[in-house]
């Protein structure tokens, strides 16, 4: 746009399509013998003599010697069933998918309006906002207008773009802004509270949890991320 005076390019910056990532992870887990349950929820998590068991809404009981809780903002209620306090608040973020001729081919963070634009296949994702309105997926039209207006300042062509999809997600945010990563109880680990950095911090989080589960040393600074 004409009001843009400059930009900073990070040569080592990378982006990922979360939907593709989930598909690849699902296939990898299945290939390693992992079981994936969909269309049901965890109603109860409780201890038993050999570890942990989760009672599903389908009636199935899933038993495990060791448990890793990574349920995003819903980790708080599940951790409470286990006797662990993990205080979090859902922070709603909006995502609008559009079809735009001549769309950017690299991801960009528009600092002033705090909006991110990311190519996703043939579409462009415009995402942003941080709305504290509890556990709901209501879409506020004013938030959507603010989101698109912020992007239009930098990309005027968005004004005539074809809208394809609109949705929102709940980010798990802690009071300190730090994620909660580590052993919560004997045989149980927790990894949650990453806010807007979930995908970015996922590999490092996975390594911390895996090293701790295998008895490998973890950095001293990881102590401040431990569940309390």
Feature-to-residue mapping (PLM):
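Active-site substrate-recognition segment that forms the wall
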Residues: 44, 51, 61-62, 66-186
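Helical element adjacent to the flavin cofactor pocket in flavoenzyme catalytic cores
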Residues: 2-66
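Hydrophobic/aromatic beta-strand patches that form the interior of the parallel beta-sheet core
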Residues: 37, 68, 189-191
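C-terminal catalytic lobe of FAD-dependent flavoproteins
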Residues: 18, 112, 152-228
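Generic structural signal for well-ordered, non-membrane alpha-helical segments
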Residues: 14, 18, 22, 71, ...
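Short, conserved active-site loop motifs that form the nucleotide-linked donor/cofactor pocket
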Residues: 33-35, 124, 188
């Amino acid at each position: 746009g004409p009001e843009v005076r400059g930009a900073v390019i990070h040569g080592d910056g990378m982006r990922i399509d979360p939907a593709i990532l989930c598909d690849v992870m699902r296939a990898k887990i299945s290939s390693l013998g992992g079981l994936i349950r969909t269309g049901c929820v965890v109603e109860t998590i409780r201890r038993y003599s050999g570890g942990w068991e989760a009672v599903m809404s389908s009636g199935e009981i899933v038993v495990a010697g060791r448990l890793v809780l990574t349920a995003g903002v819903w980790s708080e209620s599940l951790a409470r069933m286990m006797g662990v306090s993990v205080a979090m608040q859902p922070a709603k973020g909006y995502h609008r998918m559009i079809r735009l001729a001549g769309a950017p081919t690299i991801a960009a963070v528009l600092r002033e309006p705090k909006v991110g634009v990311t190519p996703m296949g043939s579409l462009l994702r415009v995402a942003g906002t941080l709305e504290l309105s509890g556990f709901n997926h209501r879409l506020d039209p004013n938030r959507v207008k603010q989101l698109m207006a912020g992007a239009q300042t930098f990309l005027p062509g968005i004004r005539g773009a074809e809208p394809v999809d609109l949705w929102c997600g709940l980010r798990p945010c802690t009071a300190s802004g730090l994620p909660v990563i580590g052993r919560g109880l004997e045989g149980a680990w927790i990894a949650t509270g990453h806010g807007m950095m979930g995908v970015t911090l996922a590999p490092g989080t996975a390594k911390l949890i895996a090293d701790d589960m295998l008895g490998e040393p973890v950095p001293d600074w990881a102590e401040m991320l431990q569940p309390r």
